[in-house]
């Protein structure tokens, strides 16, 4: 009986140091690939959150426009329509620290409104609408004020 146990022990094999190092190397390579992908997905998600918040704020502005035929900068009115966002008057989008802060930059008597918001990734997004023109979009990583030249397009 003892002889059989000794023979069985000799037949047992473990992993060599080289095999363990190869496994560790493979895991390290997979992690090196996965982390940048994860971080990119996180940035895109933060940007989409800011864009979604802007679209919701814009829908609130459209409700006001439908009722009054003019856009508003009145943050209390907008909060009454869409209370999940924090409305701020002014063009200080670059100073935003709250992802739910929507800056009502302008609401002109000519029927133009500009809304701005900043994502947690640091990119600022803007929406502009005019009574006589389609909605336009802009984004800026430097968070320029609207008074400066932004490139307005039909999509972000």
Predicted ranges, named:
Residues 34, 41, 61:
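Conserved alpha-helical elements of the SDR catalytic core
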Residues 1-15:
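N-terminal leader/signal peptides at the extreme start of proteins
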Residues 11-38:
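N-terminal single-pass transmembrane signal-anchor helix
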Residues 59-156:
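Periplasmic/extracellular, small/polar-rich flexible segments of pilin-like filament-forming proteins
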Residues 7, 40, 76:
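Phosphate-coordinating loops and pocket residues in cytosolic domains that bind phosphorylated ligands
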Residues 37-54, 68-69:
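Aliphatic-rich helix starts adjacent to a transmembrane/signal segment
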Residues 14-16, 47, 51-56, 63:
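Extracytoplasmic/periplasmic mature domains of Sec-exported, cell-envelope-associated bacterial proteins
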């Amino acid at each position: 009986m003892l002889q059989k146990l000794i023979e069985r022990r000799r037949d047992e094999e473990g992993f060599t140091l080289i095999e363990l190092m190869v496994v560790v190397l493979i895991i390290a390579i997979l992690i090196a690939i996965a982390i940048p992908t994860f971080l990119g997905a996180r940035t895109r998600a933060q940007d989409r959150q800011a864009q979604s918040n802007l679209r919701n704020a814009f829908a609130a502005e459209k409700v006001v426009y439908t009722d009054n035929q003019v856009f508003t900068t009145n943050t209390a009115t907008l909060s009454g329509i869409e209370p999940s966002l924090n409305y701020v008057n002014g063009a200080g989008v670059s100073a935003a620290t709250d992802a739910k802060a929507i800056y009502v930059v302008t609401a002109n008597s000519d029927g133009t409104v500009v809304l701005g918001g900043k994502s947690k990734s640091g990119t600022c997004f803007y929406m502009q609408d005019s009574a006589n023109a389609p909605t336009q979009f802009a984004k800026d990583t430097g968070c320029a004020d609207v008074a400066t030249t932004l490139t307005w397009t039909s999509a972000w």
